[in-house]
Regions:
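N-terminal export signals
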Residues: 5-26
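Cleaved targeting-peptide boundary
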Residues: 30-35
Length: 139
């Protein structure tokens, strides 16, 4: 068989496979998407400690967090401006963590690894107790 014949056969097979998959998809049971949780921590980090906190976050915390079951993402956000309403002036960073479920997040925070890495981030904050930590469910 020549190259043209092989190419036609491959394309025909691919087209048939795509057609079969499109027809079969509606018959398959639809799986409900997982509803994740998201945790927000409002942080007050003095300007003199920002670089240190960000180095710890990106260099220590993130590489450890990604290893844990249920982890989806973690972000550190620096507040630019308040567009509407009010917010505590000292809260200049927001830590954002997303996990597949609260149960898996609880496993992560109970781990020795979390006990080692979170206090390093936390130490850069001015407020070490009673800072806002808010948990949301995806709906």
């Amino acid at each position: 068989m020549n190259r043209r014949g092989i190419l036609k056969s491959v394309l025909s097979a691919a087209a048939a496979a795509l057609g079969v998959n499109r027809l079969a998809a509606p018959a398959q049971a639809q799986v409900a998407p997982t509803k994740h949780i998201r945790l927000y921590v409002e942080m007050d980090v003095p300007a003199a400690r920002e670089r240190e906190m960000l180095q710890i976050f990106h260099g220590t915390f993130v590489p450890e967090a990604v290893k844990h079951e249920g982890y989806i993402r973690v972000k550190m956000l620096k507040r630019r401006t308040i567009l509407q309403g009010t917010a505590p002036a000292q809260h200049n960073y927001r830590f954002e963590l997303e996990f597949e479920s609260e149960e898996l997040r609880q496993k992560w925070i109970a781990s020795a690894e979390h006990q080692r890495v979170w206090p390093q981030v936390e130490r850069a904050m001015t407020t070490l107790k009673d800072y806002p930590v808010v948990l949301y469910d995806e709906v």
